[in-house]
């Protein structure tokens, strides 16, 4: 990169840092999306009040080792699990709200698919990553870019606290993560523009 504002003798060489290089070297990764719509294909998370009950979520034959063994077989070096997508259903027993695996029959409400996924990744030498949608939550009637809509059971401040709690849980309870993936844009409020 050469800038016309620099002396012709002065050049800037941009190189990736160590973490950027590690990510580039991983080359092949997989994303695993396992959410409430797997069990309810007609479910539309934007239709507030129609979310499926956690009692219908019971992947009794789930095998995260099979997921990660398959990923390793295709040459993947990392895998990303969608821990919470737009439905708002959480694949770990979050303390932030009730729409999660803790209120499902899966492992009698004691299951934690995020923990199972991370353990499988470590077992097979695959670097674990987590995807979390913070800008949409059908259960709480929140839509991009993270705005609480009219009729929501929570205020914007309460939703922001829920997001903070869930992100703290995800980044604190599962050890070192290779990738953290956010989707859906950023809220461009006056606070963030200043």
Model-assigned labels for residue ranges:
Residues 5-194:
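Mature catalytic domains of secreted/periplasmic carbohydrate-active enzymes
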Residues 1-3:
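Bacterial N-terminal signal peptides
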